[in-house]
């Protein structure tokens, strides 16, 4: 049994519910995982996080931080689902800008750019421009 072997080696088993095939994305699926000995779940779905918490599982809610509107909805979702941890993605946006800027299509960096340093960092990583609603940064 993979779960028992992992536990014997001091590892915790967290199931990514958004990617796991063959397991219902509902209360029954969560109960099944808890019965199998899984330690917790990862999911973008607040309802899955709530079900898992009710089943006594450890929870990580995953968020994609794309823009300031999305950040606002993250706070609301966290308040409703109360995960044990959150994962905010992407974690390495500078690296992604650099990778794509080496191609033939120009890259514009946008979303969550709030400071002059963030503008210059995006340009330094290879973006040709920055898209922001922050008027103070329009003339940087």
Show the residue positions of the predicted features:
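Generic structural signal for hydrophobic
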Residues: 6, 33, 52, 77-78, ...
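Short beta-strand/loop segments at the ligand-binding rim of alpha/beta enzyme cores
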Residues: 6-18, 37, 55-64, 101-110
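Strongly charged, low-complexity linkers/loops
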Residues: 73-101
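Glycine-rich phosphate-binding active-site loops on the catalytic face of alpha/beta enzymes
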Residues: 47-48, 90-96, 111-140
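Structural motif
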Residues: 36, 55, 80-81, 125
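Catalytic beta/alpha-barrel core
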Residues: 1, 14-21, 36-49, 60-68, ...
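Short, small-residue-enriched loops and turns at beta-alpha junctions
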Residues: 19-24, 65-69, 94-95, 115-116, ...
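Generic hydrophobic/aromatic pocket-lining and core-packing "Φ" positions
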Residues: 3, 30, 49, 74-75, ...
């Amino acid at each position: 049994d993979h779960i028992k072997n992992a536990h014997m080696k001091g590892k915790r088993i967290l199931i990514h519910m958004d990617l796991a095939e063959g397991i219902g994305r509902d209360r029954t699926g969560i109960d099944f995982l808890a019965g199998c000995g899984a330690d917790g779940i990862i999911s973008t779905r607040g309802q899955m996080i709530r079900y898992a918490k009710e089943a006594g599982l450890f929870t990580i809610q995953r968020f994609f931080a794309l823009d300031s509107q999305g950040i606002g909805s993250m706070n609301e979702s966290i308040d409703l689902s109360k995960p044990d941890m959150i994962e905010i993605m992407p974690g390495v946006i500078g690296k992604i800008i650099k990778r794509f800027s080496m191609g033939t299509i120009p890259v514009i960096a946008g979303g969550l750019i709030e400071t002059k340093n963030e503008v210059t960092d995006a340009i330094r990583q290879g973006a040709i421009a920055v898209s922001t609603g922050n008027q103070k940064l329009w003339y940087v």
